[in-house]
Amino acid sequence: MEWVLQRSYFKTGTLGALFVNGKFRCFTIELPWRENRRNVSCIPEGRYEVKPRISNKFGNHLILVDVPQRSLILLHPANDALGELQGCIAPVSELSGIARGLHSRRALERLLVIHRDAVERQEAVYLTVTYNAHEYLRTLSKTHPAVFPHPAGGGD
């Protein structure tokens, strides 16, 4: 099963849209790109296997396998990337600002069901992380510049 995370980078965070087999499933929030430095940067673009994981802190969640120069990169609930993430990815149902979202647990639960169904069919799940300046982000940066500044690296 193929999941694709299409990201837009901003100075203070990274926003994404996650698609499963081509269908939009949720938004994501992450830390800004800071040269893949541990605990302060989102992960590099690439293709990663997604596996289930359980911990006392997050309960059921997902982990990305073999992220270069990183370990324990999780998909777990968080609504404020700068305050709650250390390089992981948080699925959210709605975006509320750069690196901020709403209803993260709900979004994660949907992904867990999709992942579990794939595992039951003995399908491996892969996440491809890529750059894509989405039209919705360009539009939001024009209509709400205080909340959604232009993506890092330029305007349109």
Q: What kind of region is each of these model predictions?
A:
Residues 1-126, 130-153:
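Cell wall/extracellular polymer interaction/catalysis modules
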